[in-house]
Amino acid sequence: INLWMKEYSSELRKIFGNRIWFVGLQGSYGRNEATEQSDIDAVVILDKVTLEDIKAYSALLDSLPYREKACGFISGKQELLNWEKSDLFQFYYDTLPIIGSLNSLKEYFTAADVRRAIRIGACNIYHGCMHNMVHEKSWEFLKGFYKSAAFTLQAAGFLQTGKYERRRKDLLNHLLPEDQAILLIGQTLKNTNLTERKEFERLSATLLSWASHWIVRC
């Protein structure tokens, strides 16, 4: 990933030059938790983004190896500075800087935005989990909801301790027991293929109860 990011950053400089405000890396590679299946969640923030910029950026990615794994986020600076603050909070803490810094973003969000991040995350999980239990009955969807819960737990851990833990194993030690259980289930499900209906119902109910707790609390 270091070689890929080096080539990526070099090509970005050739195309966009001093218009680059920030380049970073998110996701499992940014957390040093990547597997062979992991995407490359690259981030680039320009002074502004036009249609021609989007086409040029897409062509840049097409020229790099592992194109099928490249995803991430591209934005103009002003759009980012005016982004939903609950998203901006996690964007700041979950992004590993490669070029530039995001330190100026800290003044844009407050404890209320952290609570909002938790509440929105919990609401989305609650709604999705409920829908899945009634309609889809999908193990893959349930795994996805547990994965989403990990991001909500990062915000919850920050709210409780004032420290943002990007890596799952570090986060685990800063959570309450009921939150630890959700994170551990998510990690177990990640590499497990289950089909048992009763287990699906049990794990769905566990996640639903957890989400309900945080919705009411925040």
Predicted regions and their residues:
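Short, glycine- and small/hydrophobic-rich beta-strand elements in well-ordered beta-sheets
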Residues: 18-26
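Catalytic core of pol beta-like nucleotidyltransferases
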Residues: 1-18, 30-36, 47-218
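N-terminal loops that bind phosphate or other acidic moieties
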Residues: 41
